[in-house]
Every structure is written in structure tokens, then in C-alpha cells.
Amino acid sequence: MLKEDENADIQVFESADQPSFLSCGIQSYLEDISSSLDDLHYASVDSYKAQGVNIHTNSTVTDLDTDNKTVVVEHQGQTATYSYDKLFLSPGGKPVTPPVDGIEKYKHVLFMRGRDWANQIKERMKDAKKAVVVGGGYIGIEAAEAFAKAGIDTTIVDVADRILNTYLDKEFTDILETNAQQHGLHFKGGETVKSISGNQNGEVTTVVTDKNEYDADTVLFAVGVEPATEWLKDKIDLGKKGIININHQQQTSAKDVYAGGDATLVPFAPVSEDRYIALATNSRRQGVVAAKNMLGKEMTMPRVSGTSGLQLFDYKFGQTGIHGTEIDNYDGNLGQTYVEELIRPQFMQDDTKIHMKIIYDKDTHRILGGQVMSKEDITASINTISVVISAGFTLEQLAVQDFFFQPDYDRPWHYLNVLAQQALGDTFGSDKMLF
């Protein structure tokens, strides 16, 4: 906003003691890659002030009056009222606390969200011997991998029957689970945690599910996030689970009030609907769109595909768009093709494979989603599939799309060409390449 209007009076209220903490970097801190949590901040109080922003830390917005255009802020036990011309809300999300008996009763029961929790987890890792991580999504496997690498006997427990079930299809997660087991990380799927018990010192000792009991001196819950919007009830329109209702210009139901981040939906590119996709990349785009519209310069939030990538032990993977598990919910005829392909020509004496899947409409051949995985870092190629989805490409277009060839990196038919060709059943000789 300041680039558009250098005289704008911008007040930022942050409930934490430091702004812009990147929770996605917690694993690097737990594994001693990042030496300090201070490294995991996208911005600082000083950097905000240097740009002319009035930043207020340890300040929680507790009330909103859209008629009089004011917010109430609590800081160190004192409250103050601020007026606004335009307001942007980004209350974010908070860890879901599942209905588990004993979850708030015992020591060493942790959540992986935010700077304070990161400190507690790192401190606990010094003494932990046996951990249970509840939740097999991105956050759960990041914590579990860090525990396992630290020599902690770690088990992931999830209600789903496989890890990362909302991100990757079974062909990929089967490989990841086997590889994780080889690194000492165990997975127990299809189980619901019912209770936690502990000893007379108030320390957790056991996790009880509907099927088993697991000894544990440390338990970490990572079962998702939910919008932190209770204080906005009856102030602006909220949807299911407290998600803030917005249009594609980031406007809420109240005049001059905009919103973005983990408390909102984003327009989904593969199909015409809005979805809850809590990613930092989406939040940044929403911030730009909101700022433009707040300044009277109309801009619409682009459709996104929920593109993301991660690493679990030996494998790097990326995913975007629709998954094969959505076949029953897709309004059409959903097709999916899984392919394993050598990355380089055989004469390079390198048998590294890439595992790939493409999701598409069987009738129109429009590409709707994709997944890639390898021991080599090919995750950036998922960005290509994301662009393809947004551009409305068909299998026929991707099958012959222009990619460079250099034997150090790929083959004459790029692996994404091969993926689309295999889906079409028209391989142009790519299935019989001698190199």
C-alpha cells in the first residue's frame, strides 16, 4: 500500500511479541538447520518501522464495530479504540484441539503452531525417548521426521488409513510409508485417539486409541487448524467452521472491511468453487489483491490450485489441483494415470526414477491435477502442472509441449511429456526410447 500511497497511515496489530513468524520453518529449527527462531520471521518490528508502518506487538484485536469503523485492541491489560478508513483482517488459524480425554491434563502434550510451541518442542526433544504424533498431514510428518532424526522412537497415529491422504494418492504414500519405516518412523492408520493418561507426576505416559495403546513420554497433536474468528461472530458474515465470507476482491460483508489468510477461502482453479487451502503463498496473493482494492484499484484474486511440496526422508514430492481420491465427488468423468519413468537417458548410468500422476477430465482431456515424487529434487516441475491447470491445457497440449533436453537433466521426451502421452495412450515412441 505504501508503494501506491506513501502518505498512507498504516497500523498493524500483532498478538505475538514478534510479527510474521513462518511456521513452515519450524522443522528446520527442530533439526538445527536454522540456529534461531529469529531466522524464521519474514519481517521484523524494525523492518516494518523502516517502511513507515506503525506496528503494535503483543496487541490483540478483541472487538470490531463496522458501523462506527473502530476496533478495540488489548495490550498489556489495557484496552484502546482505533478508527479506520479501510480495515484488513488476517486473524489466521489456531491448532485444532480434538476431543481427547486428558489432552489438557498432562505435561509434554504439545502442538506444532507458532513460535512459542516451537520453543517448547525443541526443549522437549532434549529428553524425549518415545513420542506419538497425532496427525499424518504436512505438519505432523514434519514434526515426526524431526523426532525420528533426533533418535526419538516415534509413531504417527492418524484416523486416515495412510499418511498425507489429502495431498498424495496411495501410489505415493505407500512408498513414503515404507521409506519412513526404514528410517525408524512408524505409522498406525485408521485409529482414533480417545484419551491420554499419565503418571502421578502429571507426565503423559500413554496414548489410547479405539484399537491400541501406545507408550509415550511425549505427544504432539497436529490435526489441522481452524479459523481464529470467534471474536468476529455477529460482526461480519462467517461461513462454516468460522471461515470469513469474502468475494474475490477480498471484501467481507462489511463496507471497507477486507480479509485474507488462513481464515478465508480461495478460488480453486481446477473446478469452479472456493476451497480452504491454508498456504502462505495464497495469503501473500490475497494481501496484494486486498491492498489494491482498498486503494480503489480493482484487482481479482487469481484462481489457485493449492500447489505445495515437501520432503520426507529420502523423497521429495509436490502436488497440485485435484487428487484421484476425489473421483466420487467430481462433477464429470475423472481420469487418472500413474507413471514411473527414468529421469535421464540410460547412457548417463543413472537409474533415478520419478513417480508421477496426472488427473484429468476423461471427456475433455483438460488437466485438473498432478503429483510428482523422486529421490531427486524435481519438485519445481509441479509448478509447471499448476500453470498448465490455470491455462486450461489438455493432455494433447502437454504431450508435445516444448521442454529443453540435456542428458544431465532429462530425456528427449521430458517426463511431463511422457506423463501426458501415457494418459492418452499415444506415446510417440517415448515408451521405447533407447536413451
Regions found by a protein language model. Name each.
Residues N7-D9, Q51-H75, Y82, A150-I246:
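A Rossmann-like FAD-binding core segment of flavoenzymes
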Residues R113-G114, V134-I139:
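Glycine-rich Rossmann-fold phosphate-binding loop(s) that bind the pyrophosphate
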Residues L2-E6, S15, V223, K316-F317, ...:
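Flexible, glycine-rich terminal cap/loop adjacent to redox cofactors
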Residues L40, G140-S195, T281-S283, M299-T325:
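Rossmann-like dinucleotide-binding cores of NAD(P)H-dependent redox enzymes
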Residues M1-N54, Y138, A146-L168:
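Beta1-alpha1 glycine-rich phosphate/pyrophosphate-binding loop at the start
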Residues K105-A128, E203, E213-V289, V388:
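FAD-site-proximal beta/loop scaffold in flavoenzymes
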Residues I246, G260-H323, Y409-D431:
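A conserved FAD-binding loop/helix module that cradles the flavin
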Residues V12, F111, V132-V133:
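Hydrophobic Val/Ile/Leu positions in short beta-strands of Rossmann-like dinucleotide-binding domains
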